[in-house]
Amino acid sequence: MWTFIHKLGSPPWFFGFSGTLVRWLLPITVTLLLVGAIWGLLVAPPDFRQGNSYRIIYIHVPAAVVALAGYYVMAFAGAVSLIWRIKMADVTMRAAAPVGAVLTAIALVTGAIWGKPTWGTWWVWDARITSMLILLFLYLGVVALFEAYDNKTAAARACAVLSLVGMVNIPIIYKSVDWWYSLHQPASIKFTGESAIDSSMLYPLLLMIVAFYCLFTVTLLLNMRAELVWTHRESGWLKQLVGDS
């Protein structure tokens, strides 16, 4: 296990390993997305209150869930970068930030679209929505910081600190509907107790969440590989690996 973790810190080994992983994971991701989308958007029954307008949850919920998970990845990479000074952690941080930002933006936009027929308005300064907007700003802040510094080491340290400080927002997002009066409904999926959503709607939602996790992983790996290509474009190991492929 420790040998594998140590290998992940090696750019040449990671580049080769990630290429193989992407080739396997990409068709799985596409299949899961297609099956989940067809199941949720076309096969699942309409909601007895919201009709077909609820179907946007098959995009909204997976995007929101994986956006939060992506922040954990970025913050963990930031901690590794600060403590052990591992360069691949910096690459992970930089690659995760734009992916997380896009997912958060998708969650906010689809939430607004869903909110119009449900709440009668596109936007309210609800605790859950506001904390998700802060999450978007945190992701964009990391992207901007990496671009603002000429010194990559200084940029990575600044981004790591911002990522770790931003972790305080994550429990606020999770618990906002419990801590404050909120228009946003409580969690529909529960691991303890009965879920608030019927199984005919729940199963395609779970499948879409898995599909979005796979999509995040593939996109993250591709971003990391692109960063390695740019950073090590003159390195012999990269030319050899690209030539062999």
Give residue ranges: language-model regions.
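Polytopic transmembrane helical bundles with strong interfacial aromatic enrichment
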Residues: M1-S245
